[in-house]
């Protein structure tokens, strides 16, 4: 049965009027989304300014899986002047492996976050000059010809499309053929499989499909009325040849003969998506002249926000998912398809590993033991390095690196000695970090040699966890003055786009070198003894992952098809 979207949009409470219009840059018949325009302007406190000394502000938005954050940044010095955030969740009651959200929730959270950040910054509308958007990668937002959302978005963490990915890979000639055609394997979680899934499982909805967007593209569409996609986020669709930065016609044909007509215009990272359209500007209390940058996926924006804009820098993001990536001057293609050969959002490339289960695992432990974050860390400190042999395979809802789409979480080594809160607390931190190190080992084999890793995300705020990172990765770990790497990166890209629009042809690295600052007080060095212990544990974890794959498949069949649980 075709899924139905809850509603096309739900931007605000009742008492509002509707504004519609044709999507600029699209053929007749394509419409901008139905935008509910509030009668109330955003409550930004009035300020009097000498226009010669008016501040120049940019906004960075990070629309993630669990929440949306907004930062107001001073374009002169890079300082964060205001912050806002709003949380939301996944749709409940879906089959195992399916992960979906209502795009309307992103819009609502974006508006709320921007308003809060503007209030904190005491900003006037005239001061805000540009907006940049970071969004969770790979999600599939299907629009009809009127620009309305057809169904909920399937997300990056959705592993229900494994069969569709296998079918596309087969038409491309298997792994070898896919890597040759795209530079990447077609993995569950990537967008390509989701489109074929819609065609196969919801044919009526597929027939309505007019435009394919990613989450950050959809927010840009709401902001500007333009449907565009920049190269960095597009490279995560498994539809783009990362070497040529062009759509792969062979891959598109493997999904549907008419798919290319449904894809938006590709733009480079230094181009703008447009300017704020009137209806959205009115909702936010901002000017229609505000520049909206190309934006990008959260990893691409995280690279900018951590200063990872020139070869030699490596970033590790410890959020809901985990990613490690490096800036490269040319494509770094993995013949095994385990490392993603993405484009970045600076017109370079971003070899990247992604694990799907990081803070999602530690937060489950914290919740179940009813701990605060400090209580969690205190408990984990009481267990020794290696947790006395208790190990976690953190594949709670499948995994991408290594590619275990049917995986589930496994605690291995449970004994009377290790059946304690402290052991489970530390083993979970160690397990998700070693899950990321599986991919880092592969990156090293492809020529990426990190001596310093810039850590960002919620996990990087823990002193103990930073030490575990340094010991598992065997590299120095540093943090950033601004911890919200993706939102800050979106703000800096917005500034880059603004300067380009003003005729100042500056490089993004000039901006990041000026504004991105390391928190040197939190520099963490690896402990040689701990490094040795973790290398042995890592080897066993990798071996377990391989040996359990057939069992994972049987287990997924048990819980999905046999309806036993």
Where do the PLM segments sit?
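A generic structural motif
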Residues: 79, 86-87, 156, 339, ...
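Short, low-complexity, charge-dense intrinsically disordered segments
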Residues: 1-7, 42
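N-terminal glycine/serine-rich phosphate-binding loop of ATP-dependent small-molecule kinases
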Residues: 31, 35-36, 42-44, 49-151, ...
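Short beta-strand-loop/turn "lid" adjacent to the catalytic site in phosphate-handling enzymes
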Residues: 119-157, 184-189, 220-241, 265-270
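Glycine-biased, low-complexity coil/linker segments
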Residues: 16-17
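Active-site core segments that coordinate phosphate-bearing ligands/cofactors
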Residues: 59-61, 162, 169-185, 189-190, ...
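Aromatic (phenylalanine/tyrosine) cluster motif
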Residues: 9-11, 49
């Amino acid at each position: 049965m075709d899924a139905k979207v809850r509603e096309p949009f739900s931007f605000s409470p009742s008492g509002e009027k509707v504004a519609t219009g044709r999507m600029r840059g699209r053929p007749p018949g394509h419409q901008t989304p139905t935008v509910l325009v509030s009668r109330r302007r955003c409550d930004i406190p009035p300020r009097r300014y000498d226009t010669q000394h008016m501040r120049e502000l940019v906004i960075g938005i990070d629309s993630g899986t669990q929440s949306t954050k907004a930062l107001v940044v001073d374009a002169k010095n890079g300082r964060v002047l205001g912050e806002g955030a709003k949380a939301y969740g996944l749709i409940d009651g879906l089959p195992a492996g399916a992960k979906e959200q209502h795009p309307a929730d992103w819009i609502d959270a974006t508006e709320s976050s921007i308003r809060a950040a503007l209030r904190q910054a005491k900003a006037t509308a005239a001061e805000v000059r540009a907006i940049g958007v970071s969004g969770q990668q790979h999600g599939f937002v299907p629009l009809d010809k009127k620009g309305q959302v057809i169904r909920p978005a399937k997300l990056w963490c959705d592993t229900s499309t494994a069969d569709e990915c296998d079918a596309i890979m087969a038409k491309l000639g298997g792994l070898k053929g896919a890597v040759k055609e795209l530079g990447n394997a077609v993995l569950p979680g990537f967008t390509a499989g989701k489109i074929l899934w819609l065609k196969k499982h919801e044919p009526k909805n597929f027939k309505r499909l007019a435009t394919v967007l990613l989450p950050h593209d959809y927010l840009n569409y709401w902001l500007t009325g333009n449907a565009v996609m920049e190269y960095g986020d597009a490279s995560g669709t498994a539809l783009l040849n990362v070497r040529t930065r062009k759509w792969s016609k062979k891959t598109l044909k493997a999904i549907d003969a008419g798919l290319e007509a449904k894809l938006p215009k590709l733009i480079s990272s230094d181009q703008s998506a447009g300017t704020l359209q009137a209806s959205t500007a009115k909702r936010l209390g901002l000017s229609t002249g505000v520049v909206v940058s190309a934006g990008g996926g959260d990893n691409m924006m995280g690279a900018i926000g951590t200063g990872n804009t020139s070869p030699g820098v490596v970033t590790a993001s410890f959020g809901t998912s985990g990613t490690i990536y490096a800036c490269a001057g040319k494509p770094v293609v993995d013949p095994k398809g385990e490392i993603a050969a993405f484009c970045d959002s600076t017109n370079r490339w971003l070899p990247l590993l992604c694990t799907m289960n990081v803070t999602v695992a530690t937060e489950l432990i914290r919740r179940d033991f009813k701990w605060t974050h400090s209580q969690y860390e205190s408990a984990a400190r009481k267990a020794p390095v290696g947790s006395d042999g208790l190990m976690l395979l953190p594949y709670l809802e499948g995994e991408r690196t290594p590619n275990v789409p049917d995986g589930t979480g496994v605690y291995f080594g449970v004994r009377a000695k290790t059946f304690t809160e402290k052991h489970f607390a530390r083993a979970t931190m160690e397990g998700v970090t070693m899950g990321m190190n599986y991919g880092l080992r592969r990156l090293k084999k492809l020529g990426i040699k990190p001596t310093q890793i810039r850590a960002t995300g919620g996990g990087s705020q823990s002193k103990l966890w930073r030490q575990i990172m340094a010991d598992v990765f065997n590299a120095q770990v540093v943090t950033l003055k601004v911890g919200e790497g993706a939102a800050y990166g979106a703000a800096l890209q917005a500034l880059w786009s603004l300067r380009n629009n003003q005729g100042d042809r500056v490089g993004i690295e000039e901006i990041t070198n000026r504004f991105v600052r390391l928190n040197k007080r939190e520099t963490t060095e690896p402990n040689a003894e701990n490094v040795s212990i973790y290398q042995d544990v890592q080897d066993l974890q990798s071996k377990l992952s391989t040996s359990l794959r057939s069992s994972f498949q049987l287990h997924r069949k048990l819980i999905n098809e046999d309806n036993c649980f």
